[in-house]
Swiss-Prot record:
Residues at the catalytic site: E204, K332
Gene behind the chain: eno
Protein name: Enolase
Principal location listed in the UniProt entry: cytoplasm
Intracellular or extracellular location(s): Cytoplasm; Secreted; Cell surface
Phylogenetic placement of the source organism: Bacteria, Pseudomonadati, Campylobacterota, Epsilonproteobacteria, Campylobacterales
Main function: Catalyzes the reversible conversion of 2-phosphoglycerate (2-PG) into phosphoenolpyruvate (PEP). It is essential for the degradation of carbohydrates via glycolysis.
Cofactor note: Binds a second Mg(2+) ion via substrate during catalysis.
Keyword presence, Transmembrane helix: no
Organism: Campylobacter jejuni subsp. jejuni serotype O:2 (strain ATCC 700819 / NCTC 11168)
EC number(s) per entry: 4.2.1.11
Keyword Cytoplasm listed: yes
Length: 414
């Protein structure tokens, strides 16, 4: 048995220049695992707590408290634990914190240790991370949801919807699917430049132009897909992030106030006009009646993803399944705080025929853990931004590496 011999953490920077936690775990055989924790901008109110210092450093965004919690409180408790018993480790972290949202230790502290331990254990066995976490059944390369036009909280522009994505279904390999996205992305840049729009990038590497409304980005994507020659092989996905513009019971966008019913009808119209295959957070996280109506209306036609609605929380997802809200769940490990809790949520979803989408955060790093994690859990889909910015391409490049060992791409089977 190999045990955890040393744990340490320190501040590093995420892709927005904000501090985040990097954790390193050393095992008794000398194997080392490290992990960098991401951070979100558009966050659900029920997410696990990201502990910040709230002092003068970095405008209050320092994470020295979380770092100290790893180096002192957590290290004292987990030294000597079996490195291969991830469940025991993660349950220990949860019990040590003593809350249901990691408000004492910080989910950025616990997740860093959880991820780093998994990496160290995989290294000790000489196994790739996806194989260690997923076993022999980890074999499916996910279909990417590539966010190539950014709006909402991820960009400084006038577009309400947060992400306009393309999904390459009609391909037999991940590398060919990714190639199609690269070509569409390049054409989009030219289209924007030629029409006098900004080609500045948002947080997730997508372009962030000012556009007339929330339909114009979709028209742009359709034009680029056609010019690239990928009609009927690439579809559209949206992350509306509607909680961000929900106030006083109405959805405020494009200078108007929409009721839940009116916004649902807007989605119905969009789905009739465009090849939209997925809508994420189409309604606000607490608009439960609206979610039920949305699912009744579109749930048998397209994928309806709950992000803020479910926050990767097994108990909240279970309640949503019972109430028939959405038919898919976004998976963000830092919303829940440990690898084990993330895996439990994925398994609950899969048992109930809810699809899963592994996801990055808008504040990311070069850490490509979620690429392995998506393959390990056979989520079938991954969101990790545009084909730009190193923290985004790190995940795509890791998936290309994995494809050499495991070449089943879900594509048309999804």
């Amino acid at each position: 048995m190999l045990v955890i011999e040393d744990v340490r953490a320190y501040e590093v920077l995420d892709s927005r220049g904000n501090p985040t936690v990097k954790a390193e775990v050393t095992l008794s055989d000398g194997s080392v695992g490290a992990a960098i924790v991401p951070s979100g901008a558009s966050t659900g109110s029920k997410e696990a707590l990201e502990l910040r210092d709230n002092d003068e450093r970095f405008g209050g965004k320092g994470v020295l408290k979380a770092v100290a919690n790893v180096n002192e409180t957590i290290a004292d408790e987990i030294l000597g634990l079996d490195a291969f018993n991830q469940t025991q480790l993660d349950d220990t972290l949860r019990e040590l914190d003593g809350t249901n949202n990691y408000s004492n230790l910080g989910a950025n502290a616990t997740l860093g240790v959880s991820m780093a331990t998994a990496r160290a254990a995989a290294a000790a066995l000489g196994m790739p991370l996806y194989r260690y976490l997923g076993g022999a059944n980890a074999s499916i390369l996910p279909v990417p949801m590539c966010n190539i036009i950014n709006g909402g909280a991820h960009a400084n522009n006038n577009v309400d919807f947060q992400e306009f994505m393309i999904m390459p279904f009609g391909f037999t390999s991940f590398k060919e699917a990714l190639r199609s996205v690269c070509e569409i992305y390049a054409i989009l840049k030219k289209e924007l430049a030629n029409s006098g729009h900004s080609t500045a990038l948002g947080d997730e590497g997508g372009f962030a132009p000012n556009l007339a409304n929330n339909t114009e980005p979709i028209d742009l994507l359709m034009t680029c897909i056609k010019k690239a020659g990928y009609e009927n092989r690439v579809k559209i996905a949206l992350d509306v992030a509607s909680t961000e513009f929900f106030k006083d019971g109405k959805y405020h966008m494009e200078g108007k106030a929409f009721s839940s019913e009116a916004l649902i009808e807007r989605y119905v119209e969009l789905c009739a006009k465009y090849p939209i295959c997925s809508i994420e957070d189409g309604l606000a996280e607490n608009d439960f009646e609206g979610w039920i109506k949305l699912t009744e209306k579109l749930g048998n036609k397209i994928q309806l993803v709950g992000d803020d609605l479910f926050v990767t929380n097994e108990d909240i997802l279970r309640e949503g399944i019972i109430k028939k809200m959405a038919n898919a769940v976004l998976i963000k490990p830092n919303q829940i705080g440990t690898i084990t809790q993330t895996m439990r949520t994925v398994r609950l979803a899969q048992r109930n025929n809810y699809k899963c989408v592994m996801s990055h955060r808008s504040g990311e790093s070069e850490d490509a853990f979620i690429a392995d994690f998506a393959v390990a859990l056979n989520t079938g889909q991954i969101k990790t931004g545009a084909l730009a910015r190193g923290e985004r391409t790190a995940k795509y490049n890791r998936l290309l590496e994995i494809e050499f060992e495991s070449d089943e791409y879900l594509g048309e089977k999804l």
